């Protein structure tokens, strides 16, 4: 390790010990390496023993900087790995850091765009509108249309910091996995690898631009969701330009009520937007925390969500959607055996799983949920309970489902903040049932035929020729099979003859040996010669 890496590693260990994060493992589970580290750095004591462990972890990550803050935010969504008293405080981590110099941001943009900003923009504000760990945002106007826009630029010094911290994270995860077998359940190496992919994706603003364009296209002319327009001509790996929007932050309940917003409809539309993305588009915004969601102040009686920051999105294939919809419907019908069978059929748990035991485990965990009214049941926690139970039966981590669960928890939490009486099941059930009708049954068959009709219309003129070629190939194949069969029969006959001759030869040789003992030397010699002759014939038969 370089001196810089050693210095950073010491800083990380120092913060961990000063916040008592070795308490994450009980004393009897501490491996030799962590115990030795704690004793050798005896001057580093827990400075916050009065605080709960979850709060100490949050404060430590906050002190370590932006890369670790975002890591903590990701861990807060992994409720399959961490209990609520750890995950809940991590959800409070704020990705806010001091802005860097506006002149430096401008220079960075000009380098990325290949010319002075004044060529394309006017009224560029050197004071950032917002600043986060990865990027910061400035406002300006397009010269050609006078449209207000925001320019998002990646921090110029962030990549080396991220690379260095990720390298240390990988090493620490590897050490933890090897030194502490009890910690392997938390899958430290896989968690860091997942975080690394997410973080590096966020460093490429072309991905975010493409995601925003796709999401905007999916909700063109929608009353439910508005996605600001992205200007691809001014967007690249380190800069993204998009339309500036004005709205009320979705967490500003007081502001929304003061504006006369229909809170019930707004909450229901949040659920509608989520399930539309998942089941209609198979493409969903996976970072719907309150900082990325605003409400259009116009037409408060018919409220519209505004989605920002499309850096993280999730996708589901048809099989995932089908099993997800069927799981929800089976769960709310309390058909736990069907839930268990679906997990096996989908390949989420091994095929040799005992269905009866799995069904019983699901029933124990999920049945108490129905003690509550349906309007109080959390979809997100339903998924969480199902996945946690399935993990005991060796369910592999499904990244797309982890993103879905995280997003569902966000949407559900926002919806119930806006309108506590929100009945998520009543709002979501029509989406699930309609999607199932479109996937199974006569309607699904008709839709499939419609979808494939252009392809078959294109191939229809070629059908007679293809049929003729297939028949010719079939005839040639039959002839070839006949030849192979005749050859096989001849070979078997030769082998049978060879075995017979070999057996006769062996018998004669044995007789020759017996005759030698009885002083019939001439007869013995003749018998031996005959036996060898039969062996030669058998060898020749095998060679053919």
Curated annotation (Swiss-Prot):
The active site is at residue 287. ATP binds at residues 129-137, 152. Pfam families: ABC1. The chain crosses the membrane at residues 496-516, 519-539. One of its GO terms (biological process) is regulation of ubiquinone biosynthetic process. PANTHER family: CHAPERONE-ACTIVITY OF BC1 COMPLEX CABC1 -RELATED, PROTEIN ACTIVITY OF BC1 COMPLEX KINASE 7, CHLOROPLASTIC. This is Probable protein kinase UbiB. It comes from Vibrio vulnificus (strain YJ016).
């Amino acid at each position: 390790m370089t001196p810089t890496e050693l210095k950073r590693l010491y800083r990380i260990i120092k913060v961990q010990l000063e916040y008592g994060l070795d308490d994450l493992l009980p004393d009897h589970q501490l491996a030799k390496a962590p115990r030795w580290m704690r004793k050798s750095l005896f001057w580093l004591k827990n400075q916050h023993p009065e605080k709960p462990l979850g709060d100490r972890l949050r404060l430590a990550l906050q002190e370590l900087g932006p890369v670790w803050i975002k890591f903590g935010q990701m861990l807060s969504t992994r409720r399959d790995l961490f209990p609520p008293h750890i995950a809940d405080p991590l959800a409070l981590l704020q990705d806010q850091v001091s802005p860097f110099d506006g002149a430096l941001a401008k220079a960075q943009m000009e380098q990325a765009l290949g010319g002075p900003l004044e060529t394309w923009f006017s009224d560029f504000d050197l004071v950032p509108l917002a600043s986060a760990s990865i990027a910061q945002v400035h406002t300006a106007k397009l010269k050609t249309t006078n449209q207000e826009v925001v320019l998002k630029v990646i921090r110029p010094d962030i990549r080396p910091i991220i690379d260095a911290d990720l390298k240390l994270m990988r090493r620490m995860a590897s050490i933890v996995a090897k030194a502490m077998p009890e910690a392997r359940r938390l899958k430290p190496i896989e968690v860091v690898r997942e975080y690394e992919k997410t973080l590096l994706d966020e460093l490429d603003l072309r991905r975010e631009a493409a995601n925003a364009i796709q999401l905007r296209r999916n909700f063109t002319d929608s009353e439910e969701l508005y996605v600001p327009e992205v200007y691809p001509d001014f967007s690249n790996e380190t800069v993204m330009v998009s339309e500036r929007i004005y709205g009320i932050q979705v967490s500003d309940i007081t502001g929304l009520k003061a504006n006369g917003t229909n809170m019930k409809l707004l909450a229901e539309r949040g659920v509608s937007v989520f399930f539309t993305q998942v089941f209609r588009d198979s493409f969903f915004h996976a970072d719907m925390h309150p900082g990325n969601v605003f409400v259009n102040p116009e037409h408060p009686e018919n409220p519209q969500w505004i989605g920002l920051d499309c850096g993280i999105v999730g996708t589901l294939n048809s099989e995932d959607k089908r099993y997800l919809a069927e799981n929800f419907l089976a769960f709310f019908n309390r058909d736990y055996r069907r839930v268990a069978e679906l997990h096996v059929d989908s390949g989420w748990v091994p095929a040799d799983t005992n269905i009866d035991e799995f069904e019983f485990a699901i029933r124990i965990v999920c049945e108490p949920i129905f003690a509550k009214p349906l309007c109080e049941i959390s979809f997100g926690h339903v998924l969480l309970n199902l996945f946690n139970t399935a993990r005991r039966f060796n369910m592999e981590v499904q990244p797309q489902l982890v993103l879905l669960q995280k997003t569902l928890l966000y949407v559900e939490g926002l919806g119930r903040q806006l309108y506590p009486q929100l009945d998520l099941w009543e709002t979501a059930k029509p989406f699930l049932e309609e999607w199932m009708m479109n996937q199974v049954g006569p309607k699904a068959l008709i839709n499939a035929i419609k979808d494939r009709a252009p392809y078959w219309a294109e191939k229809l003129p070629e059908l007679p020729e293809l049929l003729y070629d297939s028949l010719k190939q079939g005839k040639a194949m039959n002839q070839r099979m006949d030849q192979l069969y005749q050859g096989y029969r001849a070979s078997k006959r030769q082998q049978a003859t060879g075995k017979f001759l070999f057996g006769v030869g062996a018998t004669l040789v044995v007789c020759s040996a017996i005759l030698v003992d009885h002083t019939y030397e001439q007869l013995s010699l003749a018998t031996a010669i005959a036996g060898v002759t039969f062996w030669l014939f058998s060898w020749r038969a095998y060679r053919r």
